[in-house]
A protein has these predicted regions:
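Conserved S-adenosyl-L-methionine
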Residues: 42-48, 136
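N-terminal charged helix/coil linker that caps or initiates catalytic domains
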Residues: 1-26
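Glycine-rich phosphate/adenylate-binding loop
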Residues: 2, 109-114, 121-126, 136, ...
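Conserved N-terminal Rossmann-fold NAD(P)-binding element of oxidoreductases
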Residues: 27-29, 52
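Hydrophobic/small residue at the entry helix of a nucleotide-binding pocket
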Residues: 33-34
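Conserved SAM/SAH-binding loop
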Residues: 98-106
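Glycine-rich phosphate-binding loop and adjoining beta1-alpha1-beta2 segment
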Residues: 51-89
Length: 237
């Protein structure tokens, strides 16, 4: 009998689809990268999704974030994601946490309940906390490095953090992870040199912020889809 996942089942098989439907995956960061990861996970039949993001949808998100439309501006990103997931798969269980995951909030959550964890947040402190807690709980984790100021989606690849080059965020993460005794981590990263955004300093100064990275609809989205694809392949084995 046909179902909404019939075409995926043709590739993965019924046993793998059952595993995906029983799986519980946490996604940290539901922005340009994480939003597309969530989309692909939902469309692949993941049964339970836990979403973590403290931010709300804003006008400047529309150029790259799948959850951002003029109708969702002002909504919590996790709430917008929950609505979208249920529109895709009404049977999915979605737990939405509008929190900023960091050392001071980490104790609220038990990572051992997850089958896989995706790190798609921007801050080094938060990323390190997620990765350390995932490893401590013996839960597979995959992390996304920088996607801002890039135009070439074909430069994205999946590798171990120890093999990354060029990406400044990956360099910082390698150093900080080594300090914590972590030498291996599956990541999505780009070999493209970061471009210099035009007029970014002026815009940042006007907003009273640090330099704002440029972004596109396709590089963060491609990274998110790669994250989800790796999770689906691993969970369906």
């Amino acid at each position: 009998m046909q179902s909404q996942f019939s075409r995926t089942e043709l590739l993965l098989g019924s046993s793998a689809m059952e595993r995906l439907q029983k799986a519980r995956v946490a996604v940290f960061g539901i922005g340009g990268v994480g939003g597309y990861a969530v989309e692909a996970l939902a469309r692949s039949g993941i049964g339970t999704l836990d979403l973590f993001d403290h931010d709300t949808v804003s006008l400047t998100n529309i150029n790259r974030q799948i959850l951002a439309t003029h109708e969702t501006i002002g909504m919590k990103k996790v709430d917008a994601a929950k609505c979208r997931i249920h529109a895709i798969n009404p049977k999915a269980v979605v737990n939405a946490y509008p929190v900023f995951y960091a050392p001071d909030t980490a104790d609220q959550f038990d990572f051992s309940v997850y089958d896989y964890i995706i790190d798609a947040i921007d801050t080094v402190t938060g990323k390190l906390c997620i990765i350390q807690n995932a490893i401590a709980a013996n839960v597979p984790v995959i992390s996304c490095m920088g996607t801002g100021n890039k135009l070439d989606a074909s430069a994205l690849q999946i590798t171990d953090i120890s093999k990354t080059t060029i990406c400044p965020l990956a360099r910082i993460m390698r150093k900080e992870l080594r300090k914590r005794g972590i030498n291996r981590l599956k990541v999505v990263y780009s070999t493209e040199e970061a471009l210099t955004p035009v007029g970014a300093e002026e815009e940042a100064a006007a907003l009273g912020k640090r330099t704002i990275p440029g972004s596109t609809a396709f590089v963060p989205g491609a990274a998110g889809l790669m994250l989800a694809g790796e999770v689906i392949r691993d969970l369906s084995k």
